[in-house]
Amino acid sequence: MKYLVVIGDGMADNPVEALGGKTPLEYADIPTIDSLAARGTVGSVVNCPKPLPAGSETAILSIFGCDPLKHFSGRSPMEAAAIGLRLVPGDAAFRCNLVALEPGDQPYEEKRILSHSAGSIAGQDALDVVAALNSDPEFSAALRAADMYIDPSPSFRPLAVKHHCDPSGVCFIPPHDHLGEVIGPLLPSGKDAALAKVFADLMRLANRVLEHHPVTEKRRAEGKLGANGIWFWAEGTAASLPDFKARYGADG
């Protein structure tokens, strides 16, 4: 038997005044969902137990039978495994979003974040941005000094891996939660100030490399947002998950 798991991630949404105080889901005409619910089993479950973050990275682990309190080690390690990036003990993985910051040569910390995805940059443009960073002498030297690399991706969310790293002493803030805000207070910080500075310095340097880079200017000329920055977040270390097929006799 085949199973289809449909996850309405964030579908509940919030009440909207223009909809009479209803959520979009409450307001919508959804006869198919209503029919499935009427013929199925409906209930409540806590997929994001406290103190873990309420997000897809914890919820999906739980939905597929892994206790996130035991097995959750961050979003990025799971994404790394999905694309074949092998983490060894001591490695830490990070999302390295390609972002759009306010254009211009004002101080980096005074810029605002315009888009957590650089306007959903994808394809060759996204690959060209990471290639520009990896080929820049100053940025590539800084990466090597940090014992890090950035894996290219045809999307706005490449992954970065840092060897010999414990990220638990640094606070990394999700960029999508702070659109339109000044980035200075949002940069990596925490009790491990030296490690936080490594990431903040790389983010600052990336903006300097990308602000007037040809791929940035090309996108702006096309009326798109330029990917003039990177943003590290979603940190995590190598995860060890139970074998799904061994436990449930099924695979995907």
What are these regions (language model features)?
Residues 2-14, 36, 219, 227-231:
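Beta-strand elements within well-structured catalytic alpha/beta cores of enzymes
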Residues 5-10, 92-112, 160-188:
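Short, compositionally biased low-complexity segments
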Residues 15-16, 168-172, 239-242:
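Short helix/loop capping segments that flank catalytic or ligand/cofactor-binding pockets
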Residues 117-229, 235-236:
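Glycine-rich, mobile lid/loop segments that gate access to catalytic sites or pores
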